Amino acid sequence: MTSQHIILNSHQRDKVVVRPGLQVHVESSVVSHLVMARGSFHGSRFVNSDVHVYADGCDLSNIRGVSSQIDIRGEGVIMDSGLFRSGTVANIELTNSSMFDFEVRDTPGSSLALHRGANDAGGDVGSVSISAANSSCEMFKIERSVAELSMADCDLTDSTFYRCMLVVKFANCNLKNAEFVDVTLSQDSMLSIPSRSTAAFRGLSKASFVDCVLPRRFYELAISAGASMDHVEVIPEDMELF
């Protein structure tokens, strides 16, 4: 990995194009249109910043987001072993990409929201929104966070969801060995699998839910696949949690 890096520490409203082979460090800045040319940007980090990244074909492995607002869009993006933490709000939209061992933890206001409970989350809670299609997301992790996940044809094997409030829409995703612990899913969360003969349905049989609140339709599909349930509360379809 190259040791060269570029530091952006001023507000940039115009397009900024960065060549491959550099670590991009953005600190206390606003970068409205950051274009990363196809190639490697291992170890890039965004600290206390507001950044919009266009990352088609980029390797953003080991990316770090700390106390920032981050928007990342692209196809063929690698974000393996990335970490967004400490109050980072993010919007991620990826296709044909990889988020192996990618982790989100401690979104803004999540600690207070989780303490109050889903019915009293309040308006000061920031969240992470992740949309992914046809992507590898094994060992994906979300902890102590409020998030919205929309994933289609993704591999979420060995993923972990811990102390979260989530809106999830999983379409034909493999949740083999996925663990949901102390998780509340909104009543409009959806789980869809086109056939019982798919790897997604077989994988769901290996998922586990402990101390969770699940909407009825989500629960019924998971239990029909053989997912493990322990201390799970099922909410009716007309009940809004958050």
Language model segments and positions:
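Tandem repeat scaffolds
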Residues: 2-242
